[in-house]
Amino acid sequence: MESIIEDVRVRKILDSRGNPTVEVDVITWNGFGRAAAPSGASTGSREVAAFPSGGVDEIITEVEDIISSELIGMDAVDLQDIDLVLKEIDGTENLSSLGGNTVVAVSMATAKAAASSYNMPLYRFLGGNLATSIPYPLGNMINGGAHAGKNAPDIQEFLVVPVGAEDITEAVFANAAVHKRIRELIQKKDPSFAGGKGDEGGWVPSLSNGDALEIQATACEEVTDELGVEVRPSLDLAASEFWDPEIEKYVYRQENVQKDTGEQIEFVKEIIETYDMYYVEDPLHEGDLEGFAELTSLVGDRCMICGDDIFVTNREILREGIEMGAANAIIIKPNQIGTLTDTYLTVKLALENRYTPVVSHRSGETTDDTIAHLAVAFGAPLIKTGAIGGERIAKLNELIRIQEEIPYSRMADLPF
């Protein structure tokens, strides 16, 4: 059969931060798939383990000695069975034996090999003929928090989304235009700014949160007027990064201010209303489903309140959030949960409950473009994958190619 696995190969490669990660090749009788795993800087405590204690070098041996022998002879099309075998080999709840990065690289490479065996693109193999919508890109403009230095804003990501774009090409270039405009505005505010960038390609200025918000808003307005494409500001606060559990407050070091949960909710609500935010991710720490629910009840009819660290692509945790009305969107990062099967099941649960799935990169990335295909296959309205940088534009340029391949493609339907 065309898709019977004949070999599984693994190697250590670099990610965008210069750290080691794993890349896997799966070879079938008539196909080939390659995938590399990313890694995050700000991670949820309930994510699966990225690698075992021995790191990437231990994984090389595990794949060559154990995983390869188990998968050879299996049909790559039977992805659910293969993912189950990977979890059985690992034998732990959090994939600490093999590591979620290893499992996701094998899982994605297998799916690619299956698609290749039947001469199909991955988005078509996974999504079928109904996979015709292209996601809007969330672009990272200013980096702060865990993605930047000590003088940067506390808020981790100042994002934009070109909601008025008619196609993905227009969307990608609108984001790039905002990125350039923001540098100009930063340099006008601070002539000493040398153009430093963070892990995800956003600028890293020495600005307060308030000044960064003003620059973000101004750039969106100016580019919207110039291009005739509406661009809306968005945020990822990554609030767990500045939540202090000992004093139970959010510590904003730039302004030397501390906020309790009620003050944090009011602060985020005020930002959403003042700057017409389209999307806000992780506005509260990862253990505060109640706070997420309260904020969603206040602004969820006009702003996406998205959970990343709080859900970690885990459908059982998402189910808890759904029951409480916590958030109305969820970040989808395959390496948080380990397998494509589990990733798909989380997306399915989200869509069934009107939670918007947002397929996302990680801060430590590679030029692997798999998530572009997953976003189209899953029908995700948004993809979060930066605005510039080789490892970021690999996904964006792949979306442009996918759009060309689908003669009846359209931009995804947004919730508002």
UniProtKB/Swiss-Prot annotation:
Residues binding (2R)-2-phosphoglycerate, per UniProt: Q156, K333, R362, S363, K384
GO MF annotations in UniProt: magnesium ion binding; phosphopyruvate hydratase activity
One Pfam family named in its UniProt record: Enolase_N
Binding site for Mg(2+): D236, E281, D308
Alphabetized PROSITE patterns for the sequence: ENOLASE (PS00164)
Cofactor note as given: Binds a second Mg(2+) ion via substrate during catalysis.
Gene Ontology BP, a term: glycolytic process
SUPFAM superfamilies per record: Enolase C-terminal domain-like, Enolase N-terminal domain-like
CDD domains recorded: enolase
Reactions the enzyme catalyzes: (2R)-2-phosphoglycerate = phosphoenolpyruvate + H2O
Alphabetized InterPro entries for the sequence: Enolase (IPR000941), Enolase-like_C_sf (IPR036849), Enolase-like_N (IPR029017), Enolase_C (IPR020810), Enolase_CS (IPR020809), Enolase_N (IPR020811)
Pathway: Carbohydrate degradation; glycolysis; pyruvate from D-glyceraldehyde 3-phosphate: step 4/5
EC number(s) reported in the record: 4.2.1.11
Regions that span the bilayer: none
Subcellular location: Cytoplasm; Secreted; Cell surface
Superkingdom: Archaea
Keyword Lyase found: yes
Disulfide bond sites: none
Enzyme active site: E200, K333
Named cofactor requirement(s): Mg(2+)
Keyword Ligase found: no
Keyword vocabulary terms for this entry: Cytoplasm, Glycolysis, Lyase, Magnesium, Metal-binding, Secreted
Cellular component GO terms held in the UniProt record: cell surface; extracellular region; phosphopyruvate hydratase complex
Family affiliation: Belongs to the enolase family.
Protein role: Catalyzes the reversible conversion of 2-phosphoglycerate (2-PG) into phosphoenolpyruvate (PEP). It is essential for the degradation of carbohydrates via glycolysis.
UniProt name for this protein: Enolase
Organism for this UniProt entry: Methanothermobacter thermautotrophicus (strain ATCC 29096 / DSM 1053 / JCM 10044 / NBRC 100330 / Delta H)
